Swiss-Prot record:
Protein's job: Probably acts as a transcriptional activator. Binds to the GCC-box pathogenesis-related promoter element. May be involved in the regulation of gene expression by stress factors and by components of stress signal transduction pathways.
Protein name as annotated: AP2-like ethylene-responsive transcription factor AIL6
Tissues in which the protein is found: Expressed in roots, seedlings, hypocotyl, inflorescence, siliques, and pistils. Also detected at low levels in leaves.
Species this protein is from: Arabidopsis thaliana
Keywords, sorted A to Z: Activator, DNA-binding, Ethylene signaling pathway, Nucleus, Repeat, Transcription, Transcription regulation
Localization: Nucleus
A molecular-function term among this protein's GO annotations: DNA-binding transcription factor activity
């Protein structure tokens, strides 16, 4: 008869009672020298056995076979003072649990077995009184206690079995001699006649080492005998075995559970994070090589509405940085086309292209490089970094993302030349003109586009040359002479006024650019010419004998002559103000 193969650990959960007195203080140890035995762990009630039913751990054949005692292999002492056997109301003290007692606990070590058979035997052995091994009966199903079930289910080493598992196995004390082993850890508790409660835990999983001829006696009131052999243990159906395997095995994504709590991963994919407020996914790539350039190690590949798109963006960025050695979310064979395209681009250019293909970020960042949304105005602002003492340079606010992206591109070309990483294609800009331009970079960056467009449009329009301007002045002089030679020359003609709106429309053709200095010089010449013509006309109509008759004329004639000399100057009173062009 082999020793039982269970590893039961039982301890009392009730107030301790007085251990029964005994003439012998030596504990009887059992032998666990069988090749397939696993000794039970027993830490039972600290009081004597009060039930009159016969108790035994092994049959008499097993006790006779246990010839070799392990009395010489003591490794630890009992927790109970042997003097407690002589007291009926003794309560255990702290020293009782510190190993200073004279009682001995036997330890069995079998070198022939594959596993080490360690046992913490009974602290109190009822065989001293009944010549039989004792184990407490009247056990109940431990599954009924939800508190212990939740407590032991959290252990990594053992879990509370279901009702089917406990039904297949017999809890501690249900059988007098031997506890039927199960495929998993078992829990049980005992309520004795004295109201005490003992807890048993079976942690033995070696179900293959069975005895074919185990005979057990049921420890109930009927004393029913039960025969259990190895065939009963091997009668598990295939479905039960598959069920046990499925319960243990875990999927590949078990470690990639989505958790919305703070401090945990928010995506099942590598390099992807989920925004806590908006629910959008962003792809991030950590690059340590750019630390020497003053940039942050965390690069952004854009924001996405779907998680798999963000994972693909991370995979492409990782393949660009680390080639085939990169750890990707999807197989590398899925990116064969993209790998060929990224060979002709730098790392920064490829990352910028990934951002442009995204649907924007969650926290105000734009899909364009160097562009962010203002948190109050709602407008888009452009900044460029590492240009002014390793600091950001503010480029202004813009109505659209595209305008802000163009301002960033122009500033990048200005400071970094043809090697600049831009949001749009480089052939969109005149790189040489931008690099030679003296316009400031910053608040005037958004006016740079208008200046370039005005310069481009002026090249297409006809320019008024010096020869054409001289010919035009001669035509205007001829028209003035014709008007002055007319009989009604005293009438006011606004066509003669060089600063009038009518003449300005005739002099300057629509759509022809001009310089303000040249136009002012032209107006001065016309004014001088008009004054000369007026003086000539005045002396021609003045009477010749006005000077000889001046002494003899009366006061009325003098007043009339004086009023005639005070003719209004048309250039002074009838000139329209200069218009701002």
């Amino acid at each position: 008869m082999m020793a039982p193969m269970t590893n039961w650990l039982t301890f009392s959960l009730s107030p301790m009672e007085m251990l029964r007195s005994s003439d012998q203080s030596q504990f009887v140890s059992y032998d666990a020298s069988s090749a397939a035995s696993s000794s039970p762990y027993l830490l039972d009630n600290f009081y004597g056995w009060s039930n009159q039913k016969p108790q035994e751990f092994f049959k008499e054949e097993a006790q006779l076979a246990a010839a070799a005692s392990m009395a010489d292999s003591t490794i630890l002492t009992t927790f109970v003072d042997p003097q407690s056997h002589h007291s009926q109301n003794h309560i255990p003290k702290l020293e009782d649990f510190l190993g200073d007692s004279s009682s001995i606990v036997r330890y069995s070590d079998n070198s022939q077995t594959d596993t080490q058979d360690s046992s913490l035997t009974q602290i109190y052995d009822p065989r001293h009184h009944h010549n039989q091994t004792g184990f407490y009966s009247d056990h109940h199903d431990f599954k009924t206690m939800a508190g212990f079930q939740s407590a032991f289910s959290t252990n990594s080493g053992s879990e509370v079995d279901d009702s089917a598992s406990i039904g297949r196995t017999h809890l501690a004390g249900d059988y007098l001699g031997h506890v039927v082993e199960s495929s998993g850890p078992e829990l049980g508790f005992h309520g004795g006649s004295t109201g005490a409660l003992s807890l048993g835990v079976n942690v033995n999983n070696n179900t293959n080492h069975r005895n074919d001829n185990d005979n057990h006696y049921r420890g109930n009131n009927n004393g029913e005998r039960i025969n259990n052999n190895n065939n009963n243990d091997n009668e598990k159906t295939d479905s039960e075995k598959e069920k046990a395997v499925v319960a243990v095995e875990t999927s590949d994504c078990s470690n990639k559970k989505i958790a919305d709590t703070f401090g945990q991963r928010t995506s099942i994919y590598r390099g992807v994070t989920r925004h806590r407020w908006t629910g959008r996914y962003e792809a991030h790539l950590w690059d340590n090589s750019c630390r020497r350039e003053g940039q942050a190690r965390k690069g952004r590949q854009g924001g996405y509405d779907k998680e798999d798109k963000a994972a693909r963006a991370y995979d492409l960025a990782a393949l660009k940085y680390w080639n085939a050695t990169a750890t990707t979310n999807f197989p590398i064979t899925n990116y064969s086309k993209e790998v060929e395209e990224m060979k002709h681009m730098t790392k920064q250019e490829f990352i910028a292209s990934l951002r442009r293909k995204s649907s924007g970020f969650s926290r105000g960042a734009s899909i364009y490089r160097g562009v962010t949304r203002h948190h109050q105005q709602g407008r888009w602002q452009a900044r460029i970094g590492r240009v002014a003492g390793n600091k950001d340079l503010y480029l202004g606010t813009f109505a659209t993302e595209e305008e802000a992206a163009e301002a960033y591109d122009i500033a990048a070309i200005k400071f970094r030349g043809i090697n600049a990483v831009t949001n749009f294609e480089m052939n969109r800009y005149d790189v040489e003109a931008i690099m030679k331009s003296a316009l400031p970079i910053g608040g005037a960056a958004k006016r740079l586009k208008l200046s370039l467009e005005a310069a481009a449009s002026s090249e297409q329009k006809p320019i008024l040359g010096h020869h054409q301007l001289h010919h035009f002045q001669q035509q205007q002089q001829q028209q003035q002479l014709q008007l002055q030679s007319s009989p009604n020359h005293s009438s006011i003609n606004f066509a003669l006024c060089p600063n009038s709106a009518v003449q300005s429309q005739q002099i300057i053709p629509c759509g022809i650019p001009f310089e303000a200095a040249a136009l002012y010089h032209h107006h001065q010449q016309q004014q001088q010419h008009q004054q000369q013509q007026q003086q000539q006309n005045f002396f021609q109509h003045f009477p010749a004998n006005a000077a000889s008759d001046s002494t003899g004329s009366n006061n009325n004639s003098n007043v009339q002559g004086t009023m005639g000399l005070m003719a209004p100057n048309p250039a002074e009173f009838f000139l329209w103000p200069n218009q701002s062009y």
